[in-house]
A protein has these predicted regions:
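Phosphate-binding/catalytic loops
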Residues: 110, 116-178
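Short, positively charged and aromatic/hydrophobic N-terminal segments
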Residues: 4, 11-17, 23
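Compositionally biased, intrinsically disordered low-complexity segments enriched
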Residues: 6, 17-19, 82, 178
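Feature targets compositionally biased, intrinsically disordered low-complexity regions
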Residues: 7-10, 19, 130, 164
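Conserved active-site segments centered on acidic
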Residues: 25-107, 171-178
Length: 178
């Protein structure tokens, strides 16, 4: 009743709401995906957030990560990955593994996986009808899978490749916004 009697206030509230919605829609939303969401995808999430912040673009991007499996749901980031991030001054303490959902497909502009196995499993969760799925290193000059350091134990190579992929992905996105 109050809103109808004070149309000026009602109009102001609606205008603020519409402005907030537009700001959200302008934001580029990226979801990084790997098998368990404890190594590669959270590493990509936090390296990309750091890259975006250093570019002064943190208000223009929303970034998360998820898993294709249920195996690690609720667990924190794997300790060697946490050390990599901590050594860079990046806080990841509150990150917990979660599984990709069908709703993620509608909520994110880019859904970026680490390898072909992830890509196949993402399509089992929800088919890529809008062309949102890519492997991270597909944006580089040398497209290939990011090896899983859980098995390879080569965290340095994984870190280097993910950093290269994030830089290439950001360049791709910014070029396509123009």
């Amino acid at each position: 009743m109050f809103l109808y009697t004070n149309t000026g206030l009602y109009d102001t509230i609606i205008q603020q709401y519409l402005k907030a919605l537009k700001e959200i829609e302008i934001m580029v939303k990226i979801l990084f995906v790997c098998h368990g969401n404890i190594c590669r995808s959270p590493l990509a999430e936090f390296l990309m957030k750091d890259l975006i912040k250093k570019q002064g673009l943190e208000n223009d991007f929303y970034i998360e990560s998820a898993a294709t499996s249920n195996e690690e749901i609720g667990n924190g980031i794997y300790p060697p990955v946490k050390r990599i991030l901590n050594d860079r001054g990046i806080n990841c303490a509150n990150k917990r593994a979660r599984r990709m959902t069908c709703a993620d497909y509608d909520n994110f502009d880019y859904i970026i996986c680490m390898d072909s196995y992830n890509l196949r499993n993402m399509n089992y969760i929800v088919s890529d009808t809008k062309g949102k799925y890519s492997r991270l290193l597909d944006f580089t000059k040398n497209p290939h899978d990011v090896a899983d350091p859980w098995y390879s134990r080569d965290f340095a190579t994984t870190e280097r490749e993910i950093e290269q992929g994030c830089n290439a992905l950001l360049k791709h996105i910014l070029n396509n916004l123009k």
